[in-house]
Amino acid sequence: MKCVILGAGKIARGFVGHLLFLSKIPFAFVEKSDSLADMINERGQYTVNILGNPQKNCVVRGAKAIRFSDVEAVTDAIAEAEVVFTSVGGKNLKDLVPLLTEGIEKKSKTGGNLNVITCENWKLPATVLRNGVEETICEEAKEYFENHVGMTEAVIMRSGIEADKELLEMDPLIVNVQDFWEFPVDASRIVGELPPILGLKLIPEFTGFLERKFYTYNAANGTTSFVGALLGYEKIADAAHDERILKILDGVYMETAQALSKKHHFPLEEQLAFTLTSKKKLQDDTIVDFIERNARDPIRKLGKDDRLVGSARLVLEYGIRPDHLAIAIAAAMYYVSPGDEFAEKLVKMREEEGIDAILEKVCEQDPNGELGLLVKEKIALLKEWGWIHE
């Protein structure tokens, strides 16, 4: 098998697997859910629906999967591969380390380069994996690991959306995806050459590219999700058309654009043009994406390095006041979603310990620091507008 995809979720099937199939590159998924792995093997194919462009819809044939628990089969597949992709969610990256380590140890005996490409919406995912493997790999394979294994990162710009019930009844593996085909990968950490994969674009100055995507797309998504939830919206596209939300969103775009322009020396006009691609995606009515999915786990999304607080810290670093990001942070602190255990924990913390506790324990910010005071100012403003009721 030329490629292995660790994970078989919506992005794994609807983006990575889709592009590999169109590139005629053989691959196998590795999946933790036995039932999903078995279903992929039983059906042997799945449908990728391109939202808004149905003529590009595709049936991915010859789909195969290995159970995550079948360690020997997984590590054999890694040892035979040229490229391993990960699409498991950042929280699960450490679970991959033992499999990657053993697979690399096996591959060190047969030789050839191996590149591991993370497809995660997470901070420094390739570093997490490389550090984990470095700590556990056997002495005999260390030289091979250092010289023949690349661990690098991709930015995933395509969204994978749960299909509706009728489509899932016809094909339980079907994925609805955005009509976006570019697959940017950090060129600096690749060893040797990658196979020719449709859409793959090697980016030499990747740090700037990654931050540009994160602080533009993720900050905008967080803003739309949490402010949209506060105003009673269920769908991202509906919220992104509300003039009240758009005013805040445009402010967030300007704040992050100014900071990114200063940090990476992009022309401001170029960065503002890039924000339009983010807004277009959020407002795309063909992408039926729910706020509940995007706002899920608000405790993580209020973390100091995540989409809102992380963006606000970047903005402050470059001498810009993050007024609109502070509104988004304030909205996130008042997010309510019964059934979301982290949202329920956040509500409990807010009601029992107060906003200062969230700033301190969740956001890791001084409640009386510049950002902490600004967020509290915006909470008062949202109450004044009647958007927050206590």
Model-predicted regions and their roles:
Residues 1-6, 10-390:
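Substrate/ligand-engaging "lid" and interaction regions
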